Amino acid sequence: MAASNPRQAEISRKTNETDISVTVDLDGEGRSDISTGVGFFDHMLDQLSRHSLIDMKVSALGDLHIDDHHTVEDCGIAIGQAIAKALGDRRGITRYASLDLAMDEALTRAAVDVSGRPFLVWQVTFPSPKIGSFDTELVREFFQALAQNAGITLHVTNLYGANAHHIAETCFKAVARVLRAALSPDPRQLNAIPSTKGTLNG
């Protein structure tokens, strides 16, 4: 499937607030080249790439003199659009996945349906409003933008945790791992769209 039909895409998105370019290879090795100007966010996107095995290049110039919000949200939009473009008609994918992921004291559950129907259920509370200078509320904003633009139904629940960095990192890693599983080809139905409707485009 991957060899004859490369699942790769490039997206450029420019507004008055941000200028973003993204390339993805869904059948990669988890290589990343991330530069958003937001250090903690770069670290999280590296984790997303590494653990999903999606090769990802993200370059962003944003209005960081205001805050990080536009850059983080717009990266979610562009990455989501790139994933959707690379998936095409979503033929042959596994579609569903769920996972509990631990990091020290934190445990987070993620579940995904690559359905073509965008939706986010977010049950994550952070013990502090910031991780360094990064606003923790932006973690949700990123995943909201990602889900809406990738056309996926995504549930993320932090079951417990005390360290805000660990909670955020388990969210990114758990989502990465369920994307890795759900986007993988299903060897038993490589040429089929995994839906009784015959479409995964909404």
Curated annotation (Swiss-Prot):
InterPro entries the UniProt entry points to: IGPD_sf (IPR038494), ImidazoleglycerolP_deHydtase (IPR000807), ImidazoleglycerP_deHydtase_CS (IPR020565), Ribosomal_Su5_D2-typ_SF (IPR020568)
Catalytic activity: D-erythro-1-(imidazol-4-yl)glycerol 3-phosphate = 3-(imidazol-4-yl)-2-oxopropyl phosphate + H2O
Pathway terms, separated by semicolons: Amino-acid biosynthesis; L-histidine biosynthesis; L-histidine from 5-phospho-alpha-D-ribose 1-diphosphate: step 6/9
Record CDD domains: IGPD
Location of this chain's protein in the cell: Cytoplasm
Signal peptide: none
Origin: domain of life: Bacteria
Broad EC category: lyase
Transmembrane segments: none
Keywords: Amino-acid biosynthesis, Cytoplasm, Histidine biosynthesis, Lyase
GO cellular component: cytoplasm
Biological process according to GO: L-histidine biosynthetic process
EC number, UniProt record: 4.2.1.19
The family this protein is said to belong to: Belongs to the imidazoleglycerol-phosphate dehydratase family.
NCBIfam families on file: PRK00951.1-5 (NF002109), PRK00951.2-1 (NF002111), PRK00951.2-4 (NF002114)
Protein name from the UniProt record: Imidazoleglycerol-phosphate dehydratase
Natural source organism: Chelativorans sp. (strain BNC1)
